[in-house]
A protein has these predicted regions:
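Class II aminoacyl-tRNA synthetase-like tRNA-binding/catalytic domains
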Residues: 1-194
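TRNA-recognition modules of translation machinery and tRNA-sensing kinases, especially anticodon-binding
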Residues: 25, 158, 162-165, 181, ...
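Short intrinsically disordered coil segments
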Residues: 62-71, 181-182, 204-206, 299-302, ...
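Alpha-helix initiation and N-capping motif
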Residues: 72, 79, 83, 102, ...
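Extended, non-catalytic structural segments that build the interaction scaffolds
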Residues: 93-97, 227-233, 320
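Generic, well-ordered alpha-helical scaffold segments in large soluble proteins
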Residues: 100, 104-112, 148-158, 162, ...
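Metal-assisted phosphate- and nucleotidyl-transfer catalytic regions
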Residues: 127-128, 206-315, 338-351, 355-356
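Extended, domain-scale alpha-helical bundle/helix-rich regions
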Residues: 192-200, 205, 245
Length: 395
C-alpha cells in the first residue's frame, strides 16, 4: 500500500534470503525488483521481488483487517482507531476527493479575483450570537470560539473587495444526529460591489461546475473506487422559501407546522420534488424569513419580513447558507436596535461600515456535508477526518 494506491508484489521462494513468514501485517517495508505488466494487478503492473527490507515492524496485531475492500467494523470502532482505519484504500479515497473539493474552491475563487484570508478563531463576541457558543477563559477574560468568520469577512470586503477562507468553525449545539458536527470546516467567501444576492448564487454555481470538472479529471480513480456519480450542476433551480413550503405541502400532503424555518423533512422533500420535476440534484431556496436570519442579513425591500438570502440544498440536505448583507451603517444600527441587541463588542465591526462599505454578500459551505452528499454517505462523521461531536473528543 502506497500513496498512489495498492502495489502488487510477487515473492518467489529462494530468490531472496528473506523469510516471508517473519513479515507482520502493517510493517513498513522497502522493496526492489523487476516491474512487469500484469493486467490483473492493481494499476496494471506488479513487482517481481529481488530484495525486501523491513523499515519498521508492527508491534501488535491490527484491530481489524485494513486490507478488506470495505472495513469490517462499525463507524464507532472506525473512529476509535481512526489513524489505522484511514489506511484502508477506500477510506483514504474519501479524503482525496475532499481535498479536490477544497482545491476546486481555492482555484476557482483565485481565478475570480478573490484574496485568501486567515481570521482568528478566538474572540470576545460571535457574529451569529445566541447560546450555541463554546466559552473559554482567555487570560482571565471571557472569550468564545468563533461560529463563523462573518464579521472579519465583511470587514475585509472593504479592503480586498473579494475574500475567502477555508477554516474550522465551532458550534456548541447538542445535536447527536447524522448531519451535525460541533467542529467542521467552512468554505467561506464574501464579495463586494454586487448587484444582488443572485451574484452570490451564480458564484457558488460556478464553483460547483469548476469543481465537478476538476474531480472528473484529477480524481477519476477515487471516484471509480467509491462508485461516485457526480451531480448535475449545469443549472441549479431556485425557489422562494414560502413557495417551496407550499409546493411540498401540496405534492406530499404535508401540513406546514413551522412557517419561519425549514424542518429537515421539508428540506428532504424539496430535494425530492426538484429531482422528480426537473432532475436537479441541487436547489437554491431563497428569501428566508427575517426573524430566522442574523441581524446583518439584508431585508427584502419589497417585503421586509423576508431577506435577500438563500440556502443551497443538495439532495435535500442544506450545505450552504448565504445572501446579501446590510452595507449601510445606519441601517445596521436600526436592525440591531430593532432586535433588542447591544453594539457592545461590535465596535470594530461597525467602524468599517461607519467609514463606507460597498454592497456585498457571501456564503458559508459545510465541507463535510458537501463531501457526505458527493459520496452518498449516511453520516457526516464518515467525511470528517477526526470528527468532533457531542460525545467525541478523541482521537
Amino acid at each position: 500500500r502506497k500513496r498512489e494506491g495498492l502495489l502488487q508484489c510477487v515473492f518467489e521462494e529462494g530468490k531472496t534470503k528473506f523469510d516471508l513468514k517473519e513479515l507482520k501485517e502493517a510493517s513498513t517495508i522497502e522493496v526492489e525488483g523487476t516491474v512487469r505488466a500484469e493486467h490483473r494487478a492493481p494499476n496494471g503492473f506488479e513487482v517481481r521481488l529481488d530484495t525486501i527490507r523491513v523499515l519498521s515492524e508492527s508491534a501488535e496485531q491490527l484491530p481489524f483487517a485494513i486490507s478488506k475492500w470495505k472495513l469490517p467494523t462499525t463507524l464507532e470502532t472506525n473512529l476509535d482507531h481512526r489513524a489505522i482505519a484511514l489506511r484502508n484504500v477506500r477510506e483514504r479515497a474519501k479524503f482525496r476527493i475532499q481535498e479536490g473539493v477544497v482545491r476546486g474552491f481555492r482555484d476557482f475563487l483565485y481565478s475570480e479575483g478573490f484574496t485568501e484570508i486567515h481570521t482568528p478563531k478566538i474572540g470576545a463576541k460571535s457574529a451569529e450570537g445566541g447560546a450555541n457558543l463554546f466559552r473559554l477563559e482567555y487570560f482571565h477574560r471571557p472569550a468564545v470560539l468563533q461560529q463563523s468568520p462573518q464579521f472579519y469577512k465583511q470587514m475585509m470586503v472593504g479592503v480586498f473587495d473579494r475574500v475567502f477562507e477555508t477554516a474550522p468553525v465551532f458550534r456548541a449545539e447538542k445535536h447527536n444526529t447524522k448531519r451535525h458536527l460541533n467542529e467542521y470546516t467552512s468554505l467561506d467567501f464574501e464579495m463586494g460591489y454586487i448587484d444582488g444576492f443572485e451574484d452570490i448564487m451564480a458564484m457558488e454555481t460556478g464553483f460547483l461546475q469548476y469543481t465537478m470538472k476538476l474531480l472528473e479529471r484529477d480524481y477519476a480513480k477515487e471516484l471509480k473506487m467509491l462508485g461516485v456519480t457526480l451531480p448535475n450542476v449545469e443549472q441549479i433551480p431556485a425557489v422562494r422559501f414560502d413557495e417551496a413550503k407550499q409546493k411540498v405541502a401540496e405534492k406530499y400532503h404535508r401540513q406546514i407546522r413551522n412557517p419561519y424555518d425549514l424542518e429537515p423533512e421539508e428540506e428532504a422533500l424539496i430535494g425530492q420534488y426538484y429531482k422528480e420535476e426537473c432532475g436537479a440534484d441541487f436547489v437554491f431556496v431563497t428569501h428566508y424569513p427575517s426573524k430566522k436570519r442574523p441581524f446583518y442579513a439584508m431585508d427584502d425591500p419589497a417585503d421586509p419580513t423576508y431577506t435577500l438570502s438563500f440556502d443551497l440544498l443538495y439532495h435535500g440536505l442544506e450545505i450552504t447558507t448565504g445572501g446579501q448583507r446590510i452595507h449601510d451603517y445606519q441601517m445596521l444600527l436600526d436592525k440591531i436596535e430593532k432586535r433588542g441587541m447591544t453594539t457592545e463588542g461590535m465596535e470594530q465591526y461597525l467602524s468599517a461600515f461607519k467609514h463606507g462599505m460597498p454592497p456585498h454578500g457571501g456564503l458559508g459551505i459545510g465541507l463535510e456535508r458537501l463531501t457526505m452528499r458527493l459520496l452518498d454517505e449516511q453520516n457526516v462523521r464518515e467525511t470528517s477526518l477526526f470528527p468532533r461531536d457531542v460525545t467525541r473528543l478523541e482521537p
